[in-house]
A protein has these predicted regions:
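Single conserved hydrophobic/aromatic residue that forms the stacking wall/gate
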Residues: 333-345
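Binuclear metal-dependent hydrolase catalytic cores centered on His/Asp/Glu-rich metal-binding motifs
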Residues: 14-29, 64, 128-176, 196, ...
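Binuclear metal-dependent phosphoesterase catalytic core
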Residues: 122-136, 227-296
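Conserved beta-sheet core of the metallophosphoesterase superfamily
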Residues: 78-81, 191-251
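N-terminal catalytic scaffold of extracellular/periplasmic and nuclease hydrolases
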Residues: 1-85, 93
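Short acidic, glycine-rich surface-loop motifs adjacent to enzyme active sites
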Residues: 38-50, 86-87, 169-189
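Active-site environment of divalent metal-dependent phosphoester hydrolases
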Residues: 12-14, 49-52, 87-101, 118-123, ...
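Active-site-proximal segments of metal-dependent phosphoesterases and phosphodiesterases across multiple
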Residues: 53-75, 175-207
Length: 345
């Protein structure tokens, strides 16, 4: 059984223009062959579908949205499922949530990780594919999109809840994949806490863990013979001028057979200045990609070095945030050093 997983998809700016005129092949032409060769293909829908006037929720950061054509494009590209546990799913409130679910289902796409309440949002997706039973668990870190008993939104990352979800999934399936939307935006390594959490998911039965959210790709590791991918990067997310890290990513294909999980990484560029489509890397570019991934993997395997890289990144990026944080809070941060603003274990 071959399962393909892609990262963050948000049809905006130039991509939105192409999709609204129905030029899906310009964006996904090189990807469709990959999805068509897979038994099941999954992508993260990083924005709600909003077809009617809707009020934005109060939050920090941009409010993202697309039309139903953004979902139709995914179906054309060969995807079977979208993950909805992310920090933008609730950007336009419950109206956006219900319209997103309706658009996905009318296009024949499965959904996981989001719903009209926490019961629906936290539900594991089960699929029978070529005689194999696959379970997909999707969750995200807490920001502005989390569902509860009475409100729509995304399934939150909660280690206790995911523990029970994995245990239950393994009773009902042959393979369980956990897809998490988390990490530090624009930082190309996982925190040590992420590593600890995702390894725990493997320990309790997950056959693979896949992460996205950071807007840049990260490395991976094999833990107890199971793969953990710490960041796929943007799949299609226009942001011209944002740099190579923003425009680089990879698709992962998981091949399940017996107790083995083999995988392939398919690197690409997306939304460059001269090409808004997803373009697979050429041979010389793939060599550079492999070198970068190997360096990330080396750092991930060394907790001390990984934490050092994280703290260095915090020091370099703290400046822009200091101007928007309450000065009194900053004084408390200084008093509490060396925990830093974004602490990790």
């Amino acid at each position: 059984m071959k399962v393909t997983i892609a990262g963050d998809y948000c049809p905006r700016e130039r991509v939105a223009i192409a999709i609204e005129r129905g030029d899906y092949s310009m964006i996904f032409g090189e990807v469709k062959e990959i999805t068509c060769e897979s038994d099941y293909s999954i992508v993260n829908l990083e924005c709600p579908v909003v077809e009617t006037p809707s009020q934005k929720i109060n939050k920090c950061g941009p409010s993202l949205k697309c039309t139903g054509k953004g979902v139709s494009a995914l179906k054309w590209a060969g995807f079977d499922c979208v993950t909805l546990a992310n920090n933008h799913f609730l950007d336009y409130g419950e109206t956006g949530v219900t319209q997103t679910l309706a658009s996905c289902h009318s296009n024949g796409l499965d959904t996981v990780g989001g719903g009209i309440n926490i019961e629906k949002a936290s539900k594991t997706l089960f699929k029978t594919i070529n005689g194999n039973r696959l379970a997909i668990i999707n969750c995200c870190e807490h920001e502005f999109s989390i569902a509860d008993e009475n409100h729509a939104g995304s399934n939150p990352l909660n280690v206790t809840n995911q523990y029970y979800a994995i245990i239950e999934a393994k009773k009902k399936s042959d393979y369980a994949v956990v897809i998490v939307h988390g990490g530090v935006e624009h930082f190309w390594l996982p925190t040590n806490r992420m590593i600890e959490t995702y390894r725990f998911f493997i320990e309790v039965g997950a056959d693979a863990v896949v992460n996205h959210h950071q807007h840049c790709f990260s490395g991976y590791e094999i833990y107890k013979n199971k793969p953990i991918f710490y960041g796929l990067g943007n799949f299609s997310f226009d942001g011209i001028g944002s740099g190579d890290r923003w425009s680089s990513g990879y698709i992962v294909t998981l091949n399940f057979s017996g107790t083995e999980v083999e995988f392939d990484l398919i690197p690409y560029k997306q939304c460059n200045a001269d090409n808004i489509g997803i373009s697979l890397l050429q041979r010389d570019e793939q060599k550079l990609f492999k070198n970068i991934i190997q360096e990330y993997n080396n750092i991930i395997s060394d907790p001390t070095r990984n934490k050092t890289e994280y703290l260095l990144w915090c020091d370099k990026t703290m400046g822009p945030y200091q101007s928007v944080i309450n000065p009194l809070y900053l004084s408390l941060i200084h008093i509490s050093e060396p925990t830093r603003l974004l602490s990790i274990s």
